[in-house]
């Protein structure tokens, strides 16, 4: 049966058609209130939010920037096999006043093989209308629906997790949302793919995001690969991005960033860096003072160990990898966004 919007429609053909119109994801402007200007970054976040706290920070920061009209969240797709991850994402979005952001779940998320981490805390402490992956569209279906409705070359995909949904989008066929196959749809609608991964320019072993789905990683990175420019915000960006230390004393107990921080670190100093927050900031632009772009004329490739390396590649002239240029300023900016409501 058709899957549209944030709900799975499972009734008859006629009723299903009616509901597909009524329950379709709200237009981009309606989801966050207001007209989307052509200059406003339009993003789709692809996340493995479940255990690592920095996925939550990226989504929280995106919501704050959306409140300020500095970006527009078209949708968020989960790429982790935790059926309740989308409920936690919905809890974050709802806490920031954006309960209607379209959500999608990776195929077979009901397998429930991923640790739940702090997702249970968010679900138990904050209101939300999505309860599991059964309540939302499939990630690839939602990708296609969202991309089809956007102007050409206007969407930035912020990939801060596994490659499963990206590979699925590449493989996807024409459907009722678009007559284009996945590769052609990406080429038409996506401006750039921003990925948190790698340790460039040297060679690295397989890191978390590759290990989650190495087959899909190869599909996105190798061979014909991804048909738009890719910016890689590599692992070095997060090592010294120690943020969130003041949340327990500066924001209310219902602040979703505080809930995540307390769950992971118990109000002590951050026990981990933050990789996904910098990736989100870089992806939406206007933060050149924090980052430097390197590696022009090259591209990432998967080495024999399943990790990423950088090499000259004339076929991908617009790919870059990104390092931090001003760590204190970056940390200050992220802390300010984490503490905002």
Predicted regions and their residues:
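N-terminal acidic, glycine/proline-rich low-complexity segments
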Residues: 32-341
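Secretory targeting and sorting signals
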Residues: 1-31
